[in-house]
């Protein structure tokens, strides 16, 4: 029979040891604004920490446009800033933009280096604005970004065989910055889908540009567990064939991310070493608003490594609609599927690089369930 006093002493000792162990874990371990990037290219070049080490007086909460702009412009210490987004923020403050120039002045949000922006409520969202990351070491997590709607699209008769309408501003532009992590962010046309815009000059009047673009020498970028929904031209990595200085830069990882009813550019790549793994693409070539055209655009000197992605696209069966030829000549895929069948592509697989970071990809048949459960804002 156990001596009661011995049993009590044993329990007490266990409790003390447990308390000591718990005391070695930071009290803020569950605070997502204190995280650094853990996957993909953003872990390289010294890693991506954002404002995770910000001093207490450099941590802001923003629930409206004025508070967000103040937090972005504030002078902060050497360890940067954290901005917590609560609820839906309308950058226009209820006053509709009248011109592209008006939108540029009132809608642009420049993100300083060493900044973490994180949604802390289930409905955290930025509307009627567009974000620029042009400085190093930025983290954006757990928010919805409604893609900006340009009130003044321009007609270009030389765009394509019949001309096209083009607009300005992406939901997020990463331009010339090193080390950016975009995690659990949802990008969507939201309240203004393309079927509401009508036509002119015989073509749909397009008020949207991109959702998320990476350009002008940006480098070491990871987009993880995010969601792109209902958009035409989604992601551009590399802005011009003539910008040859981008070669050796534009290192981007996109993984475990949803592409739902995305027509094209998921992503379209020039020059970059781009790793695309465990992404879930779902759509249809006959969708009434966002018909699928292609996913991965092979542009000039692009070096795409596609790995264990799952494509569920009604109306396609082969690689020609997965990897679109836009001047590239190499493309490596391993383990991806199209409507449950192994993807086979005719391109040279000699992309000339392998990921320098560790990762453990799922099999393609596990991707849909994982992405549906975990990708996008509100799922951290």
Curated annotation (Swiss-Prot):
Q: What's the top EC group for this one? A: lyase
Specify the pathway: Glycan metabolism; pectin degradation; 2-dehydro-3-deoxy-D-gluconate from pectin: step 2/5
Q: What molecular function terms (GO) are annotated for this protein?
A: metal ion binding; pectate lyase activity
The protein's required cofactor(s) are namely: Ca(2+)
Q: Where does this one sit in the cell?
A: Secreted
Q: Where is this region: Disordered?
A: 191-210
List cystine links.
none
Q: Which residues form the signal peptide?
A: 1-28
- GO CC annotation: extracellular region
Tell me which family the UniProt entry assigns to this protein. Belongs to the polysaccharide lyase 1 family.
Put simply, this protein is called Pectate lyase
């Amino acid at each position: 029979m156990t001596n009661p006093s011995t049993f009590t002493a044993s329990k007490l000792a266990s409790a003390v040891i447990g308390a000591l162990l718990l005391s070695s874990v930071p009290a803020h371990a569950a605070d997502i604004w204190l995280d650094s990037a853990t996957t993909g290219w953003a872990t390289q070049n010294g890693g991506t920490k954002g404002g995770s080490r910000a001093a207490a007086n450099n941590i802001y909460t923003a629930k409206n446009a004025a508070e967000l702009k103040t937090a972005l412009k504030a002078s902060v210490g050497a360890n940067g800033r954290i901005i917590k987004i609560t609820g839906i923020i309308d950058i226009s403050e209820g006053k509709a933009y009248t011109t592209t120039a008006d939108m540029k002045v009132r809608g642009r949000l420049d993100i300083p280096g060493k900044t973490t922006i994180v949604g802390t409520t289930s409905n955290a969202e930025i509307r009627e604005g567009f974000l620029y990351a042009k400085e190093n070491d930025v983290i954006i997590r757990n928010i919805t970004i409604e893609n900006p709607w340009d009130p003044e699209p321009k007609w270009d008769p030389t765009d394509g065989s019949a001309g096209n309408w083009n607009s300005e501003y992406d939901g997020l532009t990463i331009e010339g910055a090193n080390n950016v992590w975009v995690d659990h962010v949802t990008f969507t046309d939201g309240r203004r889908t393309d079927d509401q815009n009508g036509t002119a000059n015989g073509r749909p009047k397009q008020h949207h540009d991109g959702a998320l673009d990476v350009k002008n020498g940006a480098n070491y970028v990871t987009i993880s567990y995010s969601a792109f929904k209902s958009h035409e031209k989604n992601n551009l990595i590399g802005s011009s064939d003539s910008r040859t200085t981008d070669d050796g830069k534009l290192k981007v990882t996109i993984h475990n991310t949803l592409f739902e009813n995305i027509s094209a550019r998921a992503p379209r790549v020039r020059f970059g070493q781009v790793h695309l793994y465990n992404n879930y693409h779902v759509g249809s070539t006959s969708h009434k608003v966002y018909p699928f055209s292609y996913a991965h655009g092979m542009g000039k000197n692009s070096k795409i490594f596609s790995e264990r992605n799952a494509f569920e696209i009604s109306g396609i069966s082969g690689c020609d609609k997965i990897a679109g030829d836009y001047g590239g000549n190499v493309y490596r895929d391993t383990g991806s599927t199209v409507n449950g069948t192994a993807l086979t592509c005719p391109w040279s697989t000699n992309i000339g690089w392998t990921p320098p970071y560790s990762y453990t990809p799922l099999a393609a048949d596990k991707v849909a369930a994982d992405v549906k459960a975990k990708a996008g804002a509100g799922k951290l």
